[in-house]
């Protein structure tokens, strides 16, 4: 049996949507964490392990790649997910030359993926460690994205490695990767606001307790 190449990715995205709809609070945050976690582990993790199998960039368009007919068993084959990066290598050549920094961060994505799923549980249960873990995860995601963008500039390889086509550059390179900078910034701000609010409550409670303890007792 054959399916279109985009089907496994669409099913995973739909699964994240369905699960997030059953959550009582912060549905968008839960969706982002689930979707991000799956991408970190299934896509980027697969590339990290099998980067050596991606040796050249694809010559077809993204639409043609997604509409290719592939065997159904590819849906759970990490080698196939790694091979999808031959398409992305068309926009960022580093994925076709096993760039050490890219491969390293793809292995780090496995940690991020696990943290995403753990954070989903913390969000649902409103666990005390939620915002500490959220800041930790967002820091790693943001740092990885910054390194992704600046290293071609640092080594003067941007024109050689990154597509010069405006659409491919701004949609596939800047747009897609920029999500892992923009959303972590938003979630980090959310965490700082929540932590500050909790400190204010504790401080207010402490002051009230001290005031009551100092209040003279009436006979």
Curated annotation (Swiss-Prot):
<feature type="transmembrane region" description="Helical">
    <location>
        <begin position="101"/>
        <end position="121"/>
    </location>
</feature>
<keyword id="KW-0812">Transmembrane</keyword>
<protein>
    <recommendedName>
        <fullName>Probable 3-beta-hydroxysteroid-Delta(8),Delta(7)-isomerase</fullName>
        <ecNumber>5.3.3.5</ecNumber>
    </recommendedName>
</protein>
<feature type="transmembrane region" description="Helical">
    <location>
        <begin position="169"/>
        <end position="189"/>
    </location>
</feature>
<dbReference type="GO" id="GO:0006695">
    <property type="term" value="P:cholesterol biosynthetic process"/>
</dbReference>
<keyword id="KW-0256">Endoplasmic reticulum</keyword>
<dbReference type="Pfam" id="PF05241">
    <property type="entry name" value="EBP"/>
</dbReference>
<keyword id="KW-0472">Membrane</keyword>
<feature type="domain" description="EXPERA">
    <location>
        <begin position="25"/>
        <end position="188"/>
    </location>
</feature>
<feature type="transmembrane region" description="Helical">
    <location>
        <begin position="30"/>
        <end position="50"/>
    </location>
</feature>
<dbReference type="GO" id="GO:0043231">
    <property type="term" value="C:intracellular membrane-bounded organelle"/>
</dbReference>
<comment type="function">
    <text>Catalyzes the conversion of Delta(8)-sterols to their corresponding Delta(7)-isomers.</text>
</comment>
<dbReference type="GO" id="GO:0005783">
    <property type="term" value="C:endoplasmic reticulum"/>
</dbReference>
<dbReference type="GO" id="GO:0005789">
    <property type="term" value="C:endoplasmic reticulum membrane"/>
</dbReference>
<keyword id="KW-0152">Cholesterol biosynthesis</keyword>
<keyword id="KW-0443">Lipid metabolism</keyword>
<dbReference type="GO" id="GO:0016126">
    <property type="term" value="P:sterol biosynthetic process"/>
</dbReference>
<feature type="transmembrane region" description="Helical">
    <location>
        <begin position="3"/>
        <end position="23"/>
    </location>
</feature>
<keyword id="KW-0756">Sterol biosynthesis</keyword>
<dbReference type="InterPro" id="IPR033118">
    <property type="entry name" value="EXPERA"/>
</dbReference>
<keyword id="KW-0753">Steroid metabolism</keyword>
<keyword id="KW-0153">Cholesterol metabolism</keyword>
<keyword id="KW-0444">Lipid biosynthesis</keyword>
<dbReference type="GO" id="GO:0005635">
    <property type="term" value="C:nuclear envelope"/>
</dbReference>
<keyword id="KW-1133">Transmembrane helix</keyword>
<feature type="transmembrane region" description="Helical">
    <location>
        <begin position="135"/>
        <end position="155"/>
    </location>
</feature>
<dbReference type="GO" id="GO:0047750">
    <property type="term" value="F:cholestenol delta-isomerase activity"/>
</dbReference>
<keyword id="KW-1207">Sterol metabolism</keyword>
<comment type="pathway">
    <text>Steroid biosynthesis; cholesterol biosynthesis.</text>
</comment>
<dbReference type="GO" id="GO:0004769">
    <property type="term" value="F:steroid Delta-isomerase activity"/>
</dbReference>
<keyword id="KW-0413">Isomerase</keyword>
<comment type="similarity">
    <text>Belongs to the EBP family.</text>
</comment>
<keyword id="KW-0752">Steroid biosynthesis</keyword>
<dbReference type="InterPro" id="IPR007905">
    <property type="entry name" value="EBP"/>
</dbReference>
<dbReference type="GO" id="GO:0000247">
    <property type="term" value="F:C-8 sterol isomerase activity"/>
</dbReference>
């Amino acid at each position: 049996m054959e399916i279109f190449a985009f089907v496994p990715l669409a099913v995973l995205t739909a699964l994240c949507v369905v699960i997030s709809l059953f959550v009582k609070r912060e549905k968008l945050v839960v969706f982002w964490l689930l979707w991000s976690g799956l991408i970190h582990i299934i896509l980027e993790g697969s590339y990290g392990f099998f980067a050596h199998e991606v040796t050249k960039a694809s010559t077809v368009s993204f639409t043609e790649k997604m509409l290719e007919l592939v065997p159904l068993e590819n849906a759970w084959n990490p080698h196939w997910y790694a091979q999808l990066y031959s398409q992305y290598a068309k926009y960022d050549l580093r994925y076709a030359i096993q760039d050490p920094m890219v491969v390293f961060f793809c292995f780090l994505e496995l940690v991020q993926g696990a943290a995403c799923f753990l954070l989903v549980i913390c969000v649902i249960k409103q666990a005390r460690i939620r915002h500490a873990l959220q800041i930790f995860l967002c820091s790693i995601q943001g740092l990885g994205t910054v390194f992704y963008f600046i290293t071609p500039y640092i080594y003067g390889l941007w024109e050689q490695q990154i597509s010069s086509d405006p659409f491919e550059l701004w949609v596939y390179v800047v747009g897609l990767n920029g999500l892992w900078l923009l959303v972590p910034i938003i979630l980090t701000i959310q965490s700082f606001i929540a932590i500050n609010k909790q400190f204010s409550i504790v401080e207010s409670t402490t002051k009230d307790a001290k005031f009551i303890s100092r209040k003279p007792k009436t006979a």
